[in-house]
Amino acid sequence: MTATATRRRRFSVGKGFAWAYLIGVLVVTIFPFYWILRTALSDNYALSADPASPLPVGFTWGPFKRVLGLATTQESIAEGGSGASIEIGHFLVNSIVYATVSTVLVVFFSTLAAYAFSRLHWRGRNLMFSLFLTALMVPGILTLLPNFVLVKELGLLNTFAGMILPFGLFSAFNIFFLRQFMLGLSTEIEEAALIDGAGRLRVLFGITLPMTSGPIFTLSILGFIGMWNDYFWPLLVTSDESVQPLTLALAVFKQSSPQAQPDWAGLMAATLVAAVPMLALFMAFGRRIVNSIGFSGIK
Amino acid sequence: MAVLETTARDQRASGEATRRRKNARRTTNPYSPAHRGDAKLAWVLIAPALVGFAVFAAYPTLRGIYLSFTDFAVLSPPEWIGLDNYRQLLGDEVFWSSLGVTVYFVLLSVSLGLVVSVVTAAVLHRITSSTVIRGLIILPFLISGVVAGTVWWWMLDSQLGIVNIVIKAFGGDGIQFLTSRDWAIPSVALINVWKQMGYTAIIIFAGLQTIPATIYEAGRVDGASELRMFRTLTLPLLRPILALVVVLNVINAFQVFDIVSVTTKGGPANASNVLQMYIYSKAFGQFDFGYAATMSLALFVILIAITFLQMRLLRASESDTN
């Protein structure tokens, strides 16, 4: 056997292992999503009798009806539910408002600040920038409790303003990230426009902002995912269903399930309903999300 | 997010930028009309961020420090009690056991997560550039900790959970994953690894792609095995990105809450009562905000110390290789 043949064989054995490993990782990653679906389409009693079946047991739409409040309380309890439901449309709107408004605001304000830090010449610029950066060192836990007290004092508990303001105005990471990107951009076009008499704001919105759209998208998508999945902060500042996001609704729904014999099918239906918007976002922007995450590490 | 690592990198970068700008200023006319009015506009542009920084970052940080010296139950004004909270902290067995539990969780979840994500990234890099596969791997990152916790709570159930059914089918004894003292933290750590692994792997994968292929040519000519090249060439080149990922994951893991709160709720008997869980229960269960602030501050100090230690270690090993 020649040396090249040996190498090629070793090569393909290694590749075989690599594929086997990757398939293993993919199965572990994806299986829980399938299991949510399979359980959500099952009947609770059939489920306890045959918990190992890979397919839905006693196929029924009942769990979704229970969760969405389309079944009567009696029906729900007869099927092993607690009678509690999730007004999905309502919580969905709350989550959309919370995640969208805070993301859009914080990315927009960060872009403005990044422009001031990267393009304008002003006294105190470096001092302000270093001051902003110190915020990167402070973990959430240190500011969350005092922020709760502050929001309470401002009378903003159970309001979108109270939920959004602490995250919608300032993000040290966003400002830093965008400033770095802007410093790396060539300023020739901007300077030409300035010489032609365009105002600073026109240059910012007409030239700099479009050229920064890549990182702006990255920060928006990562910010949106983070806010959509946020649980701790809304848990602190909301107790009223009128503003609570989906994550809280799911946690409340889970708690209302009887502990001795939980309504597994209903819980999984609720979980699926809570996960669907993110899965839809993923279908729409999958490639860009993947690239955004990779990009966020390298920058 | 990219906290300290980026801060350090930025200081270098901003140093460069200032130097560049100083040079630029020397050559252009300092009285150039191009920068007239810059200052006024700059303050307008940073105004929203400045308000956010002052009101929701700086003020709460200082106030948190102040509250840690007070007895404060939210409804009545805080009362200064000096070091009482700190004395209480030193003697609070639940706090120290929480800290122990949290450190155990961080070690398990960060080390396991790092190994799995490095291997996954390397495998991906080696055999496929499919965006679909990379996309599938980050799916768990897109869902909330509440959703992830609820699903695994079901899959790890001791009676009907599929994981135990499979274990029993292979002749094993069922495991009380979330309800036994020994398994509570490892289980929560596994769920956390499941949720975060793909995200970390994609960042490392992106790092791998920036390594030029020519670096490996010399090794290949010498007949070095792929594993050896991975160890001697790839890993050292990846070190900055691995450091970033470890710092991020450690900081996040120290503040774990969502997954614990929907799976074990800190139980059984405090076996998985991680720090953030304990702080939350002190503040919102017993309305002891002063003491909760003291514990938050302690957690902050621990995080700072660990991060500096990690940066030190990183810098030390960097100077070794140079």
Label each residue range with its predicted role:
Chain B
Residues 25-37, 322:
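Alpha-helical transmembrane segments of integral membrane proteins
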Residues 38-322:
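A structural signal for multi-pass alpha-helical bundles of membrane permease subunits
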Residues 24, 29, 171-175:
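Low-complexity, charge- and small-residue-enriched intrinsically disordered regions
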Residues 1-28:
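Short, intrinsically disordered terminal tails adjacent to the first/last structured region
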Residues 4, 10, 29-32, 122, ...:
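Generic secretory/membrane-interface signal
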